[in-house]
Amino acid sequence: MALKLFLFALLLCLPTSLSSTASKGKEKKSKFNPYRYTFIDKASTFSSSSSSSFSSNGQDSSYDYIVIGGGTAGCPLAATLSQNFSVLVLERGGVPFTNANVSFLRNFHIGLADISASSASQAFVSTDGVYNARARVLGGGSCINAGFYSRADAAFVKRAGWDPKLVKESYPWVEREIVHQPKLTLWQKALRDSLLEVGVRPFNGFTYDHVSGTKIGGTIFDRFGRRHTAAELLAYANPQKLRVLIYATVQKIVFDTSGTRPRVTGVIFKDEKGNQHQALLSNRKGSEVILSSGAIGSPQMLMLSGIGPKKELQRLKIPVVLENEHVGKGMADNPMNTILVPSKAPIEQSLIQTVGITKMGVYVEASTGFGQSPESIHTHYGIMSNKNELFSTIPAKQRRPEATQAYITRNKYQLHEAFNGSFILEKLAYPISRGHLSLVNTNVDDNPSVTFNYFKHPVDLQRCVEAIRLVSKVVTSNRFLNYTQCDKQNVHKMLSLSVKANINLRPKQLNDTKSMAQFCKDTVVTIWHYHGGCLVGKVVSPNRKVLGVDRLRVIDGSTFDESPGTNPQATMMMMGRYMGVKILRERLGNKAGV
């Protein structure tokens, strides 16, 4: 049934612009260039001769900055740094511009269902038994998420030690290029009214700001349903000083350990043909390698490069460059639970538009519809359907591996929905429970082992119980009766439906739906907002420099001990711009021009 594919896709949360403000006077988009920008090319094109034009001193083929990961933070960071310095971005995935499963809202779930080697998302399952995904595409998580855009609150900015003035300047830099005001669907309007009815007040209208009450947030989907990703922020770049290599998988960061402190000299990466290359960092003062590979990729890369817990590095025979027991520690994921709401009639597709920001530290959102049609499918895989029986268009009683495969073959372009409806979700802000990340092997292409310890702390579980009670009130509110005809007596039926949906690999108590605590444990999933692993004060300094080594920073969500705002992508992109400006000003002062 469509429930499983649709639910998994959104639970894993996580275009072409009609007018580009940034591109005026900057990089012109080539009509026939599948990579859109002339500075983007495949990793196999890298050579000493081709990179020498970016040399900062005219003597060797080196770069002032090498950014590992062209994601939500990496793209705006690279675009900003390129205003004054030579920058090389190494992205392990491809481009989003010609990928229909990334570009169109109606294909949101299909893009996440694609688990092929060239997919924009790489699936993994935490040791908690919860399905998850990490981006593998230029633009990062902004290419595979639900598109909701909302800023962090002022308290987060203060705790981060950021300059409030520069933060306020950096958010609009992102918003001008890729963010839009959504056109509310009827269901999202119903959610808005229901939240107000049950007391999530006041109504704050359409705003990017994080304020208590009910509001409408921004979206990176335009009115035509096309996604605009962080990759489009590269339109701000100086094309003469930026080079972006796709399908460039960094193997490790290279250090010179002959001095008193390890000093970064470059990186080794593999191209799409399997050939290895070494990119060199300029010897100029201030040159750096910047890790922007996300909360999974950045701690993994540090350990593969010899920075991390000594015993773990020695276990895998990785030469120890710097012992730091905190690498990979402090991992957290905001637990999400949902109540599935069947509908009497087909519902227009919508991703996150309306959000209720409660004072109990819980965010309430909703998503509806299935959106996919036979014409919209470009690559269809079903979410690991052959192994985990999650293929959504097969009725539950028929969902066996052999039946699933036969169904895919027989009905690849003739899919229909076995479930019609939507779900209301609650995300727990500021979880206390913490986990860890560790290497499985030394192959960077393989996922590390990740544990989040959902609800290990009793306070997290109690807050989830309160949140589910709130969501139950929302779905039984007067405003939702027109859609669901669900009264208070039917709530447990919906809870039972939610538990039975095969949305994780955790043991379930199917006969205990009256226990809200058990419901939380049974139905926990991710909303893609995992963070930690390279925390400030433990692995990096407040300015994101890696402690104990020279010429290395980490700028991404791995440095956060909490997820900013209702959804973090706005702050991730803002941080890329913010840190880029800070770095330029540190090196050039008033001459930076930003």
From Swiss-Prot:
Keyword terms of this UniProt record: FAD, Flavoprotein, Signal
Gene3D superfamilies xref list: 3.30.410.40, FAD/NAD(P)-binding domain
Any one GO molecular-function label of the UniProt entry: mandelonitrile lyase activity
UniProt-reported outcome of changing G435R: In hth-3; fused organs and increased genetic instability
Positions of the catalytic residues: H529
Impact noted for substituting G356E: In hth-10; fused organs and increased genetic instability
Co-factor(s): FAD
Signal sequence, renumbered to the chain: 1-19
Effect of G294E: In hth-2; fused organs and increased genetic instability
Binding, FAD: 64-91
Swiss-Prot/TrEMBL GO biological process terms: cell-cell signaling; embryo sac development; fatty acid omega-oxidation
Top-level taxon: Eukaryota
Tissue expression remark: Expressed in roots, leaves, stems, inflorescences and siliques. Found not only in epidermis but also in all sub-epidermal cell layers.
Gene Ontology terms: cellular component: extracellular region
Miscellaneous comment as given in the Swiss-Prot or TrEMBL entry: Mutations in the gene for this protein reveals an unusual pattern of genetic transmission in which progeny plants inherit, at relatively high frequency, DNA sequences different from those carried by their parents. The instability observed is not random but seems to be confined to the restoration of sequence information in progeny plants that, although absent from the parent genome, was present in the genome of an earlier ancestor.
Function: Probable FAD-dependent enzyme. Involved in regulating post-genital organ fusion. Required to limit cellular interactions between contacting epidermal cells during floral development.
Family membership noted in the UniProt record: Belongs to the GMC oxidoreductase family.
Protein name: Protein HOTHEAD
UniProt lineage: Eukaryota, Viridiplantae, Streptophyta, Embryophyta, Tracheophyta
